[in-house]
Amino acid sequence: MLKMGVLLFTFLVLFPLATLQLDADQPVEQYAGNKQDLNPDEKREMILPALRQWQCCTMAWCDSGCLCCE
């Protein structure tokens, strides 16, 4: 009876948990593979707008909305 319980626990609990964990890893690997295929111009198009979000201010006007540039 104990052997049957161990067998049922293994196949009904542990095996599905291991399978679900493997499925969760696949989209991340696929997304990383797609990002590596971008050419440098496409990468630059994605990065430059993010860099332009900050504005450059003088030290007298420096606050949280801009970077202090000298």
From Swiss-Prot:
Q: In which tissues is it expressed?
A: Expressed by the venom duct.
The residues forming a coiled coil are none
Q: Which UniProt keywords apply?
A: Cleavage on pair of basic residues, Disulfide bond, Neurotoxin, Secreted, Signal, Toxin
Task: Give the main localization category.
Answer: secreted
From which residue to which does the signal peptide run? 1-24
Q: Which cysteines bridge via disulfide bonds?
A: C56-C68, C57-C66, C62-C69
Q: Which GO terms describe its molecular function?
A: ion channel inhibitor activity; toxin activity
Which GO terms of the cellular component aspect does the record hold? extracellular region
Q: Where in the cell is it found?
A: Secreted
Q: Please provide the record's free-text comment about the domains of this protein.
A: The cysteine framework is III (CC-C-C-CC). Classified in the M-1 branch, since 1 residue stands between the fourth and the fifth cysteine residues.
Annotated family: Belongs to the conotoxin M superfamily.
| Protein name from the UniProt record | Conotoxin PnMLKM-013
What is the organism of origin for this protein? Conus pennaceus
